[in-house]
């Protein structure tokens, strides 16, 4: 049974990481092709996606599939990458 729990934890972490990567790709495409970061639509999409991911992470933490520290690290890592992306888009204006 412990091996099964480890597998579920690894799978939960991988799924959350994949969702974070999808958000990053979505925002990259939006910045490159659709709108500027100051656009309300951009901000709404980003806020909605980040909120959704935070709820997924909270759910996984409550099920003890990942630790609270791992969840925070996933969000912080995504936020850092998004900030870098945002700064790069500002420098190209």
Curated annotation (Swiss-Prot):
Membrane-traversing stretches: none
UniProt xrefs under Pfam families: DUF1507
Matches recorded under SUPFAM superfamilies: EF2458-like
Family the entry assigns: Belongs to the UPF0358 family.
Protein name: UPF0358 protein OB1428
């Amino acid at each position: 049974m412990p091996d099964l729990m480890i597998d579920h934890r690894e799978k939960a972490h991988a799924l959350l990481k994949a969702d974070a990567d999808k958000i990053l790709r979505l925002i990259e495409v939006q910045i490159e092709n659709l709108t500027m970061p100051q656009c309300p639509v951009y901000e709404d999409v980003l806020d909605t996606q980040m909120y959704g991911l935070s709820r997924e992470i909270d759910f996984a933490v409550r099920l003890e599939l990942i630790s609270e520290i791992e969840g925070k690290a996933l969000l912080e890592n995504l936020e850092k990458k998004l900030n870098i992306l945002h700064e790069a888009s500002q420098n190209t204006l």
